[in-house]
């Protein structure tokens, strides 16, 4: 179990806020199994705002089209250090550090034809520009018929491993079911040299619908979430749990994305408390 920045902070969490919540969790909740701090979506967007997404946002990317922490929100990431300083501080509290990531490759990298690390391919050659997320314009999907697509995920996960990331939450991947994306992440995790937990999350217009997930999900190497944030609609979430039982097994189970208490800065109720459990 752990804490996820989406609840309370939405898209605009800062390093100071992450550390404050991590310190509280280490002091009061770690003895009860709360051991993972996850920085959710838009950590790579300098201009992220509470309350929604910015279409066509300019992102913080490295020369290979991989997301970097926005230094105005995560000052310790300056000078190319990425999330390693923050991860080190989280680890120093006895906790694990996790990141949210959207499937695919940034549209900005495609626009600028940035190279894919270790290959002769460029982002515009490996992108599937017909594959888009319905609610976030940051990324295109990847064309997994091109070897550079797997190479991009491999390089992304190597970078995360070098920062000391322990957990990834891959979003917009189960609704619809992107089997190739899940398999590509699995290979990238195996090749990264890191020790990971992972979660593949539903993202679609009807998050409360029961999912029928195929057996290959067992190779995801972690958890599959049934839907979006639970809020106060627990009974509406139960069908998703039952649907996922056939795909559970050793090292792979069913969980919730978030179980929220209080309000959220991404909505009208203001910032209170939240949790990923």
Predicted regions and their residues:
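Extracellular/periplasmic catalytic domains that process cell-envelope and extracellular macromolecules
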Residues: 30-32, 90-92, 161-162, 190-193, ...
